[in-house]
Structure formats: C-alpha cells, structure tokens
C-alpha cells in the first residue's frame, strides 16, 4: 500500500479505501475501510486536560460532564472531536463552537451523536471505547 497525504494533511491510500490513524503514548490506532471516509483517535487515559476544557468544550458540553470523572469525560469528548475532524477532513476548525457533542453518559462503550458545522451541518455517530489505560474513538460512513 502506498500512503499519500491530501492538502489538508489527511492520509489516503491508493484505491477506494479510507484510512485514518492516531497515536498516544505507546499505542497506535489504524483504521482502513472501504468506506468513503474514516476517523479514529486514541488517547491515554492518564492525560490531564481538565484545566483546558474551556478551549475545546462549549458550555452545553461542560454541563453534562460527570463531576466524579470530569477529566476522563472531557478526555473522551476530546477523543470524539478528534475522530470527527479526521472523518470530515477539515482543518483549522473551532473545536469549541463548530463541533457539538450531544449529552452522553460516560460508560466503557458508547456512541454519542456529534453535529459538525463547517461548509454545511452534518450529524454523525462516533463510537468510543474505554480500556484500562487508553480511549479509542472512531467512525466510518
């Protein structure tokens, strides 16, 4: 397989396959699918992002965060938004005001709805999975 990059930085391979990849700590996530687009993100669960949530979460999203597991819930939202960006192949988008996650309960597995506003509004479902030391979020069409 030959790996190429679009002008936006999104990777692609020859043929009709979509590809997305991510890395965090010692983990790498790779998705290859025959769908038109794919987005995947992986994050280490020990990453502390609570102090920066105002940068990437809007007030509605901050309001639904679990108070007992606020950092983990915020990190899950970050992971979901990263997967959405990769899926839609947009760069320079405002994470806080252009990507909206519908309220969801923090579980080990979930599939919240995400609204992204760029050239047009689109809604997708993004799956997430939590393991002992990492989070994985992904979507395909």
For each predicted feature, which ranges?
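Core catalytic alpha/beta fold that binds nucleotide/phospho-ligands
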Residues: 1-141
